[in-house]
Amino acid sequence: MSDINLKIGLAEMLKGGVIMDVVNAEQAEIAQQAGAVAVMALERVPADIRKDGGIARMSDPKLIKEIMSVTSIPVMAKARIGHFVEAQILESLGVDFIDESEVLSPADDLNHIAKDNFKVPFVCGCTNLGEALRRIGEGAALIRTKGEAGTGNIVEAVRQLRQVNKDINYIKGADQSELMAIAKNMQAPYDLVKYVHKNGKLPVPNFSAGGVATPADAALMMQLGAESVFVGSGIFKSADPLKRAKAIVSAVTYYNDPKILAEVSEDLGEPMTGINCDFEKFSQRGW
């Protein structure tokens, strides 16, 4: 068990950057060359997990070690929701962050991992503020939207980030006497609801993930209030991964400059083939 403030401090260092999914050492090197602040090591990007079906589990430790060996930036890896043994294995490998991820098949449909029991910081997804505060209450040091990973469709990530912002503004404007009832309705820890009321933000960094496929998508999430962006299938399922990766990194840095966004969006080749979000939703996994 370690200090949550230290874990949050490590997450704060990723602000204003891009975290990229990679499935091998070569992709990890491309991501680092493009300016990624971290990589997510996994065997299959979410688009392939959707296409292949079956049970998606933690990646092979050999793959994770290979990716860690070629990059000097932080390496994240995914564990299934509730699968604390996968998390123990990942921590033993020395990964920098663990993502308790809805992209993988849940191992426990009632309980998430008790993240306070680990020294490594955890990333968790959310669709609304109540879900975010529950994960933070369990020890998460970094929150992201769930979006709909593997679709190239930004609509769910936008909906979820707007909902979190709406919920934060509601609590910020509430009377202090209403906070306990709000905590009850949101199923959120009371002390965290009080924090949001006082500070008007989450107590941990708030990133965006799920469906980011273009520089414009990344800039959109930043303008909506995300502090960094995860990109999964959108880079290495595109025609020119290195060029697109560099463009998305630039878009996150200059998200408020339409001229630069236009420049970096030019001649990127075909993006990943997107799909609609009217099928099984990964974002409905977990609670």
Curated annotation (Swiss-Prot):
<dbReference type="InterPro" id="IPR001852">
    <property type="entry name" value="PdxS/SNZ"/>
</dbReference>
<protein>
    <recommendedName>
        <fullName>Pyridoxal 5'-phosphate synthase subunit PdxS</fullName>
        <ecNumber>4.3.3.6</ecNumber>
    </recommendedName>
</protein>
<keyword id="KW-0704">Schiff base</keyword>
<dbReference type="InterPro" id="IPR013785">
    <property type="entry name" value="Aldolase_TIM"/>
</dbReference>
<feature type="active site" description="Schiff-base intermediate with D-ribose 5-phosphate">
    <location>
        <position position="78"/>
    </location>
</feature>
<dbReference type="GO" id="GO:0008615">
    <property type="term" value="P:pyridoxine biosynthetic process"/>
</dbReference>
<dbReference type="InterPro" id="IPR033755">
    <property type="entry name" value="PdxS/SNZ_N"/>
</dbReference>
<comment type="similarity">
    <text>Belongs to the PdxS/SNZ family.</text>
</comment>
<dbReference type="GO" id="GO:0006520">
    <property type="term" value="P:amino acid metabolic process"/>
</dbReference>
<dbReference type="InterPro" id="IPR011060">
    <property type="entry name" value="RibuloseP-bd_barrel"/>
</dbReference>
<feature type="binding site">
    <location>
        <position position="150"/>
    </location>
    <ligand>
        <name>D-ribose 5-phosphate</name>
    </ligand>
</feature>
<dbReference type="Pfam" id="PF01680">
    <property type="entry name" value="SOR_SNZ"/>
</dbReference>
<comment type="function">
    <text>Catalyzes the formation of pyridoxal 5'-phosphate from ribose 5-phosphate (RBP), glyceraldehyde 3-phosphate (G3P) and ammonia. The ammonia is provided by the PdxT subunit. Can also use ribulose 5-phosphate and dihydroxyacetone phosphate as substrates, resulting from enzyme-catalyzed isomerization of RBP and G3P, respectively.</text>
</comment>
<feature type="binding site">
    <location>
        <begin position="232"/>
        <end position="233"/>
    </location>
    <ligand>
        <name>D-ribose 5-phosphate</name>
    </ligand>
</feature>
<keyword id="KW-0663">Pyridoxal phosphate</keyword>
<feature type="binding site">
    <location>
        <position position="162"/>
    </location>
    <ligand>
        <name>D-glyceraldehyde 3-phosphate</name>
    </ligand>
</feature>
<dbReference type="GO" id="GO:0042823">
    <property type="term" value="P:pyridoxal phosphate biosynthetic process"/>
</dbReference>
<feature type="binding site">
    <location>
        <position position="21"/>
    </location>
    <ligand>
        <name>D-ribose 5-phosphate</name>
    </ligand>
</feature>
<comment type="subunit">
    <text>In the presence of PdxT, forms a dodecamer of heterodimers.</text>
</comment>
<comment type="pathway">
    <text>Cofactor biosynthesis; pyridoxal 5'-phosphate biosynthesis.</text>
</comment>
<keyword id="KW-0456">Lyase</keyword>
<feature type="binding site">
    <location>
        <position position="211"/>
    </location>
    <ligand>
        <name>D-ribose 5-phosphate</name>
    </ligand>
</feature>
<dbReference type="GO" id="GO:0036381">
    <property type="term" value="F:pyridoxal 5'-phosphate synthase (glutamine hydrolysing) activity"/>
</dbReference>
